[in-house]
Amino acid sequence: MVLLAVGELSASLSLLEECWHYLFLGIIQGLTEFFPISSTAHLKVIPLLLSWDDPGVAVTASLQLGSIIALIAYFWNDLAFLMRGISKASFQNSWNNQNTKLASAIVLGTLPIVFAGMLIKLFWQGYETSPIRSIPAIAVVSIVMALLLLIAENVGRRTRNFENLSFWDGQIIGFSQVLALIPGVSRSGITITTALMIGWERKSAARFSFLLGIPAITLAGLVELKQAFGSFELVDVFPLLLGITSSAISSWIAIDCLMKFLQTQSMMIFITYRFLFGTLLLFWYYLAF
């Protein structure tokens, strides 16, 4: 009986610890997916700093579901309006309107990252363990992205919005999204940076980035989940659901905060954070290892 009691206590502590890990990682996923600071980088670095095991592809893909749910829920009215506009255009055979332009931009902007992702899966078998995903690489990329965002803040005219959306906007921003396959770049970071560089105002740049992210994040999450299917045991289900829930809630908060923040503020807080994050990460890595 004593041995059984000890075993049950140990199991409960293990489950409690696992719940805490998933809860915390879900919050990190949600906040860093939509703030332009790279969720992949933080989900790789933070567990390492805390001496936790690497969460792995299966866990990060699952946590990404929470971000997808929050993103679709937050922009549900935009998506419904977009679909109604497309439906109306199809009945009237009139495709030269803002809804169809936006839908085309999202579809065309998603194609480059889909093809690039497929090529990596097919031909780069060592991608998950390649030097491009190492801590020093993530640190350097974070610093480079800080500099690019700083340039975008200073050279962008910030005069364009959805009223001025063109065919090339979707192409240019979509091709830049491919760089998000490099850990540390940040999908929202590179797309917002590119939009600012070609003259978009901050809030519109963020909104288009998030709308463009719906198919990209959804497809990436589903592909990784399919590959990882069957790797979870029954005991993992509750902690995993807890992580997905915390990811969804923190994602919603991050999206809402960023949209409101960019109405009046610049990107300097994120530029500063990314520069400090990359610099401190380099120092820590070379001192620790």
From Swiss-Prot:
Q: Which reaction does it catalyse?
A: di-trans,octa-cis-undecaprenyl diphosphate + H2O = di-trans,octa-cis-undecaprenyl phosphate + phosphate + H(+)
State whether keyword Transmembrane helix applies: yes
Q: Any idea what job this protein has? A: Catalyzes the dephosphorylation of undecaprenyl diphosphate (UPP). Confers resistance to bacitracin.
Q: Which UniProt keywords apply?
A: Antibiotic resistance, Cell inner membrane, Cell membrane, Cell shape, Cell wall biogenesis/degradation, Hydrolase, Membrane, Peptidoglycan synthesis, Transmembrane, Transmembrane helix
**InterPro entries registered for this protein in UniProt:** UppP
Membrane topology type: Multi-pass membrane protein
Some GO term, biological process aspect, for this entry: which one? cell wall organization
**GO cellular component terms attached to this protein's record:** plasma membrane
Coiled coil, from the record? none
- Could you tell me where this protein is found in the cell? Cell inner membrane
The EC number(s) this enzyme carries: 3.6.1.27
Q: Please give the Gene Ontology molecular function terms for this protein.
A: undecaprenyl-diphosphatase activity
Q: Looking at its record, which EC class is this enzyme?
A: hydrolase
Return the similarity comment.
Answer: Belongs to the UppP family.
Sequence intervals crossing the membrane: 23-43, 56-76, 104-124, 135-155, 165-185, 210-230, 235-255, 269-289
| Organism of derivation | Prochlorococcus marinus (strain SARG / CCMP1375 / SS120)
**Miscellaneous notes for this chain?**
Bacitracin is thought to be involved in the inhibition of peptidoglycan synthesis by sequestering undecaprenyl diphosphate, thereby reducing the pool of lipid carrier available.
This chain is encoded by the gene named uppP
Q: What is this protein called?
A: Undecaprenyl-diphosphatase
